Amino acid sequence: MDSKAVSPLIGFVLMLAIIMGLIGIMQAQWVPVWNKEVEAEHLSKLEFEASEIPKIMFISATTGKQGVASIDAGCEYPNRGFLINPSTASTSLKAIPLSVDVKFNETLPNGSLFRYSNKFTTYAIIVQPNYFYMQKPEIIVEHSAVIKTSGNSALNVSSPVSFSRNKVHLFIVNSTFSSISTPNTLNLQFIPVSYGGDTFVKNASITLKVLDETFDWWNKTLKNIFGAGNVTADGSRKEMTFRLFNTTLSMSYLIVQASIGERAKLNERIEPYRIFATSSNTLSMLKGEQRELNVKVLDIYNNPVRGYSRVSYSVVSGGDKCRIVSASPQTDEKGVFTVTVEAVNSGNCDVEFRIDSINSGFNKTKFSITVIPVSSGGLGGQGYLSFTPASRGLVEIYHGPVNGFIDPTKPPAESPRDLITDPNWEPYALEDKELAAYNDGSWDWWSGEYVPTSGYLEKTQNNAQSKQNSQKNHASQLFEFNVGDVQMSSLKVFWNGIAWLDVQNNRNDGVVLYVWNGTGWEYLCDTTSSSEVWLQCEKRGNYIQNKKVYLLIVQNDWTQTWKGNRDSQIYTDYIELDILT
């Protein structure tokens, strides 16, 4: 053999062996390191995409529009030449059933107490990448929180958007899938079915069923939000119970479905759960007067049932005393159904609203009406005059503090002139006075202001608001009605609004209404509710002083800043004075 030919061959074989050895080392040691970096980068992206899911649910639940969260499920490993890489790693999604138990007491506008108790199934969504090199962590979307678990540890990815001290918004999520695995982009579509309602609750109890691996995380998180004394953890049942005080509670029901590519369509209709009056169930009307009666239809999630037309209504007694003139074709965006009734003859009549599909005691409500005969006064035979701030120049509104202890048996000592000239009192601007003429505002406890709900509110404004935060001052409002030279035999006042003291478990919410008799304030009516209510006050007598009638509204409790933030507040959304001759 030619030695000169053998030497290059041996060298080539040795070189090839060295290269193959290096490739083997790279394949065994370096490729896993490089691919772990790829997986870590993909995991970070998955965490970000999962953290967007609660935000999308919140937007869908507040706007009523479908939201989509995209999950880049495939982890692609780059081409490394002669090195061998696995195929694209897929990601699995699982929907795990949990539960939410909700209990609260609600004071209705008519003053009655509604006790609510329901338990719902909701789903947690678990995102788990099927990596070849790293451990397979779970990214859990549960009760609006995003938590990453690996081994025995649970780490916060994003805090729950559902919970704060002043606002709780529960997402009841129903899933159309149980598990799915794909290396492709996955769209999670959230379809809001029930949304748009909220309830101010004095006290409530919420119980969340949570996953075993997130139980300790929830125990710590909820105690940080609501206080350790308000949270109870049941380790055996994996349930967290927390209590709410003076909080706005909302529940939204959404359906989530997973799809690859185009969005799917899904329709589900929520049926009515209860119907109730939006004002007092008892009222007085003058013969010939027409008035709207409003009821609200809510579903089991305490949200308005919109576009519902199967509301039955009729005069169930006293058919010769009043009659129904017209009715709305269906419920509006707030779930309100309206009937216009006319007082025909003096006496009593009842108007009932009913939904036959509701199989409970919440399926009907009734208005009891007293029809008052019209006296012959100097008003062209009509018998009454009506005044609201919508009539420019007819009503002046002032606001400021009333000092000292006030109750219905001990009215304020200040006269209307004392209040008007008090430097601590001031009049409302024209636009605020006009706003108090319409029942068009709704109180948002989260933002702390009235929210516009009709064309009368061109911008968010404080509707005839009075807030006092100095010691022993009641928030108060004075309404000066310029009624002119008329005769009065009695008066009737309609007031819609809300009044409260900023302190938990307070028993002194609400207002007292007074009328000025020329020498002092006389009691008209009152409420101790912290919810938005309708008050109707009636009183016989002549309360016209120098062609004016003065009404005073005083919040029930005074501020005590030396004890902390206890602000006495009133919002008036509607006021009307009717003078009967």
UniProtKB/Swiss-Prot annotation:
Taxonomic lineage of the native organism: Archaea, Methanobacteriati, Methanobacteriota, Archaeoglobi, Archaeoglobales
Record's protein name: Uncharacterized protein AF_1625
Superkingdom to which the source organism belongs: Archaea
Keywords: Signal
Residues spanning the signal sequence: 1-28
